[in-house]
């Protein structure tokens, strides 16, 4: 039997879903222009690093903490994590890009579902108390749909792997079949990343590799680009 609850959340993982992920490489384009990433093998190495760093210590850990806050109706905790997600994202393009994607996801989620938490989150943005982050909104949507946090994180990590791989297919470039092989190859690493997220302490939040952040910052000065970040 198909689990429609999970399918409703998985809809937001579609690389064609209009979240704006299509326009962001989150530093990948800088690595490509420097010829550090030039084929499927070098891209996989970068993607694993992105999973193990930014998506573990930032997005993934934030999702775990937000889910606990939702379970305890702790609005101040949610706002605190929203603020941390914004201020610890030092590269301007990725910081602004995450805010834009978060805004799109919140608006789309409100069009599709009547989630009190997402409606509250949107109101906090209008009151200038929140920035809106895609990882936080995705967690709120999964919580509203009754999906467990482990699955929510798995789906979010998969969405990032899928969208970044599609962007790599365009930018390196790679073939579509090569792209699908990469996604298949990364699935076990998604599970490993989620397990690592559940071993972290709250004090570990934001421990992103400086090399990744520096390349995200350097993207502001690339001569030719196809991505916003």
Swiss-Prot record:
Q: Which UniProt key words apply to this protein?
A: Chaperone, Cytoplasm, Nickel insertion
PANTHER family, per database record:
UREASE ACCESSORY PROTEIN F (PTHR33620:SF1)
The terms under GO molecular function for this entry are: nickel cation binding
| Name of protein | Urease accessory protein UreF
| Gene3D superfamilies, sorted | Urease accessory protein UreF
Q: How would you summarize the oligomeric state and partners of this protein?
A: UreD, UreF and UreG form a complex that acts as a GTP-hydrolysis-dependent molecular chaperone, activating the urease apoprotein by helping to assemble the nickel containing metallocenter of UreC. The UreE protein probably delivers the nickel.
Q: Which domain of life is it from?
A: Bacteria
Task: Outline what the protein does.
Answer: Required for maturation of urease via the functional incorporation of the urease nickel metallocenter.
InterPro entries tied to this protein:
UreF, UreF_sf
